[in-house]
């Protein structure tokens, strides 16, 4: 069997069957739900009807039993179910209610079981499954599998259903690849933005407020301010106008936009006033507001393109189990922009957005991958316009020599799109920037411009984000930098540590004020702790880029002894020179 990503998924899928077999041997009361392969491994959902909760000790026993099963060189055999109703009845009789439910749904799809057999042909285990699987367990190396953790998972992801126990695991072709992945997980755990969020006092999510609603603490809001300043400056340089729109709007607006038909379950509604029949909605998107601003004036081909941007906060309902730190929230700020242009301007506008994305991600030292999603089976708008739009997106990327993948049929019903997946320091990809064409909203709101021949035409509309969600992007940045923000973003850029408060505090105070007046984010650490403790805490624990130590020699020479995060001592420089160096780093966004 050729070893590639596709066959690795097959191997992992087979491992999920082996895990289910091991669990049912050790825990006969366990009932099976689903167990697919994933990009990073596999999982299986179990219902332990006696209420037992899997422990770390249980995972070790299950993993050992899996290795015993693998050693037996068992085969996987596909079996077409001849009598589906009989099989459903058997599942129910065995208490396998989840398998019975799945089979009932797929009974007209030629459903199959996969049988796990020993060398004598005895069936040791079976599972409802479409496959495929590896031929036998000899393809799996016992030292290349690892059970990772247990988590709760609602049956079918529905909070109204029973909570099951999901065992996450992974498997590789060999132990070296497994060890590399486990090392990666260790590093990812150290960088977890939820952990660093507490350690560095960056943000919190409080039960009293609600899940997925973020409190930005001063440290992280300082980072956000710097990024928003960059955002505003760059947008103005690139010809955008910046707007602000309300947090709520009448439901009628969302009926016109189509959100009430397609997005209602994700929207927050405000209770109707007793004196009015008007229903208000907390905005899930900024687009309709920008269209209304467009409508406020007459437009001709000469006034286009109109590039309109907003740091607009939106709210979208999420299931509580899906919420996670900053990366999956219910209230977030989008760096949203909508561009209204003529068809002839489309390719140039796309190119300018791609430049914007590339320039921005370069600042954060992030690469990116690109995907083009094309027309789905169900779509709105004219087929010719779709073909022109897709051709325009391809042309813009092809002219730049950009590599991109095509997701056929994966575009939104209202237009094709380009997605940019940024790569962080660990090589993980995150969905951030998007360019989305929209044939739906311009028609729904009947927006027009006057063309050269005097006729009224519908403009091309582009939705565009660079960061996506500000909350999500900051979560990504925390992990990308492992909390050690570069100087221009660091909440505190310099810590000043006097060796002796009695002898050196006055000069340290002077240096502190001079740096503060220069616009540097600086703190004076005049606590009674030891000098080494304060240096270590600043550089390692609080991840401050620079520490300036002040003693007798520094006072004599009007200088500071500089320690740099990740480097250590870098020498003594004059106060003015140090300030100039920091100012340059900040200006260069280093």
Question: Residue locations for each model-derived region?
Answer:
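NTP/phosphate- and nucleic-acid-binding module
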Residues: 1-31, 39, 45-590
């Amino acid at each position: 069997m050729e070893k590639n990503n596709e066959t690795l998924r097959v191997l992992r899928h087979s491992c999920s069957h082996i895990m289910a077999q091991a669990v049912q041997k050790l825990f006969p009361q366990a009932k099976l739900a689903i167990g697919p392969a994933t990009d990073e491994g596999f999982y299986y959902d179990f219902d332990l009807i006696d209420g037992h909760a899997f422990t770390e000790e249980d995972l070790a026993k299950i993993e050992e039993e899996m290795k015993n099963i693998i050693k037996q060189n068992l085969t996987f055999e596909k079996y077409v179910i001849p009598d589906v109703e009989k099989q459903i009845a058997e599942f129910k009789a065995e208490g396998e209610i989840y398998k019975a439910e799945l089979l009932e749904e797929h009974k007209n799809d030629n459903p199959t079981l996969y049988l796990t057999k020993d060398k004598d042909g005895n069936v040791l285990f079976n599972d409802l499954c479409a496959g495929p699987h590896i031929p036998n367990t000899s393809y799996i190396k016992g030292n290349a599998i690892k059970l990772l953790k247990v988590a709760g998972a609602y049956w079918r992801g529905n909070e109204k259903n029973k909570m099951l126990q999901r065992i996450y695991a992974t498997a590789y072709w060999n132990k070296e690849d497994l060890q590399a992945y486990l090392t990666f997980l260790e590093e990812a755990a150290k960088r977890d933005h939820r952990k660093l969020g507490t350690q560095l006092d960056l943000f919190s999510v409080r039960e009293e407020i609600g899940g997925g609603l973020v409190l930005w603490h001063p440290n992280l809001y300082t980072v956000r301010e710097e990024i928003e300043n960059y955002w505003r400056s760059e947008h103005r340089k690139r010809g955008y106008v910046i707007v602000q729109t309300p947090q709520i709007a009448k439901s009628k607006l969302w009926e016109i936009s189509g959100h009430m038909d397609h997005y209602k379950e994700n929207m927050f509604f405000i209770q109707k006033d007793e004196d009015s029949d008007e229903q208000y909605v907390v905005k899930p998107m900024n687009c309709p507001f920008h269209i209304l601003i467009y409508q406020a004036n007459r437009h001709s081909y000469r006034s286009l393109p109109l590039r309109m941007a907003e740091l607009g906060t939106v709210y979208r309902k999420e299931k509580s189990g899906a919420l996670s730190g900053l990366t999956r929230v219910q209230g977030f700020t989008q760096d949203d922009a909508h561009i209204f242009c003529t068809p002839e301007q489309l390719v140039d506008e796309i190119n300018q957005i791609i430049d914007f994305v590339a320039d921005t991600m370069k600042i954060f030292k992030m690469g990116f991958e690109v995907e083009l999603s094309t027309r789905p089976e169900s779509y709105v708008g004219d087929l010719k316009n779709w073909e022109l739009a897709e051709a325009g997106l391809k042309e813009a990327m092809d002219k730049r020599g950009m590599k991109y993948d095509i997701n056929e049929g994966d575009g939104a019903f209202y237009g094709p799109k380009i997605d940019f997946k940024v790569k962080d320091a660990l090589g993980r990809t995150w969905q951030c920037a998007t360019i989305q064409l929209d044939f739906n909203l311009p028609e729904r709101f009947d927006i027009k411009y006057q063309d050269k021949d005097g006729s009224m035409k519908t403009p091309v509309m582009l939705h565009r984000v660079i960061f996506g969600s500000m909350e999500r992007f900051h979560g990504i940045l925390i992990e990308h930098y492992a909390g050690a923000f570069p100087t221009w973003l660091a909440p505190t850029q310099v810590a000043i540590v006097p060796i002796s408060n009695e002898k050196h505090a006055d000069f340290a105070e002077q240096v502190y004020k001079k740096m503060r007046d220069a616009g540097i984010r600086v703190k004076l650490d005049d606590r009674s702790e030891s000098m080494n403790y304060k240096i270590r805490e600043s550089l390692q624990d609080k991840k401050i880029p620079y520490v300036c130590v002040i003693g007798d020699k520094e006072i004599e020479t009007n200088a500071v002894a500089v320690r740099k995060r990740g480097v250590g001592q870098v020498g003594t420089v004059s106060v003015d020179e140090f300030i100039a160096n920091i100012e340059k780093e900040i200006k260069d966004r280093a």
